[in-house]
């Protein structure tokens, strides 16, 4: 019994997460290559390993031979083939493992900086965190443990490339699954998410259980759950929006804390005209337009923010223009407004 071979196979299988059968096959192939190198390509050579005892048998033209007589050059050939085959098996194992984890969060330690990108030690391999997938303003030091989303896994020839992300919207989604059990258990559903990494995220949630407050559960007792997520993101602001099937209600919720006076929906153009008082205008639009931009992405509507004066002027201009057309009366104009056509621009865009 070849206990030493069995021990080596067992050790490689554990360390590299490779099936033992694959390793036995690799050794048989390496011995076959060595035998062909020693005896010549024309010879009929067969190599087998007993999986229970570890005993090796090499046959040449049906005759049992001693593989230890192959010589140094043949042994070197066997070594090279074995190393190559085990590397291929390990690459396949890593590819399979991380392909299954694509879209999930993984924890690793920063190994080194490669220009503006980071190499992250994931145990059996390294992940690549490019600058474009980092949160703006964040810095990390070597040895620091960080959490990332497994964004992409691909075989690039001699190694597996694992692209990581901390700026992708799904990173937020997975963090909520980790921090909020009701999200993990699918009692609370993340219906939509819009993110500008490092600055602000809006996440719309709903609950299938009327006894569970979706917003309160995500915030946690005294804000404990949302604080953990914000801390992980380096202070990025997160607005938790209560989902509603009504577009008007959802848009209103997404623009909070701004107070909405009126919303007009134009379904043909996918445009929502939101009216707010002058005092609420900057709050609704947000810094550099961020609040309304994220609300638009969250709800799927192109949102225009107007003051009551601007809204009234648009309606007045529309009415004056329509009055010049023969046969147009108040009822027709009211129908246009009900369809979300509230100014001349809307009228032109719908092709009137």
At which residue positions do the language-model features occur?
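RNA-contacting regions in translation and RNA-metabolism proteins
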Residues: 1-352
């Amino acid at each position: 019994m070849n206990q030493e071979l069995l021990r080596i196979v067992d050790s490689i299988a554990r360390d590299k997460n490779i099936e033992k059968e694959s390793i036995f096959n690799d050794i048989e192939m390496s011995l076959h290559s060595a035998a062909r190198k020693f005896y010549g390509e024309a010879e009929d050579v067969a190599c087998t390993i007993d999986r229970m005892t570890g005993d090796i048998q090499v046959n040449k033209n049906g005759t049992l031979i001693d593989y230890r007589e192959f010589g140094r050059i043949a042994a070197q050939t066997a070594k090279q083939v074995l190393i190559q085959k085990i590397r291929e098996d390990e690459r396949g194992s890593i590819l399979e493992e991380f392909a299954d984890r694509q879209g999930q969060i993984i924890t690793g330690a920063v190994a080194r900086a490669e220009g503006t990108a980071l190499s992250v030690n994931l145990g059996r391999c390294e992940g690549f965190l490019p600058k474009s997938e980092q949160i703006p303003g964040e810095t990390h030091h070597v040895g620091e443990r960080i959490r990332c989303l497994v964004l992409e896994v691909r075989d690039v020839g001699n190694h597996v490339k694992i692209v990581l992300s901390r700026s992708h919207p799904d990173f937020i989604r997975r963090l909520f699954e980790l921090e909020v059990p009701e999200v993990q258990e699918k009692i609370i559903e993340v219906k939509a998410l819009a993110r500008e990494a490092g600055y602000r995220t809006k996440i719309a949630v709903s609950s299938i259980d009327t006894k569970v407050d979706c917003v309160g559960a995500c915030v946690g007792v005294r804000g404990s759950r949302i604080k953990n997520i914000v801390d992980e993101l380096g202070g990025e602001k997160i607005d938790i929006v209560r989902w509603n099937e009504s577009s008007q209600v959802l848009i209103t919720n997404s623009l909070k804390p701004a107070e909405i006076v009126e919303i007009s929906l134009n379904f043909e153009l996918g445009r929502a005209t939101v009216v707010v008082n002058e005092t609420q205008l900057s709050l609704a639009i947000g810094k550099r337009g961020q609040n309304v931009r994220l609300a638009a992405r969250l709800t799927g509507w192109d949102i225009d923010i107007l003051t009551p004066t601007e809204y009234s002027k648009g309606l007045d201009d529309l009415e004056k223009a329509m009055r010049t057309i023969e046969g147009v009366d108040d009822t027709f104009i009211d129908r246009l407004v009900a369809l979300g056509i509230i100014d001349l621009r809307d009228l032109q865009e719908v092709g009137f």
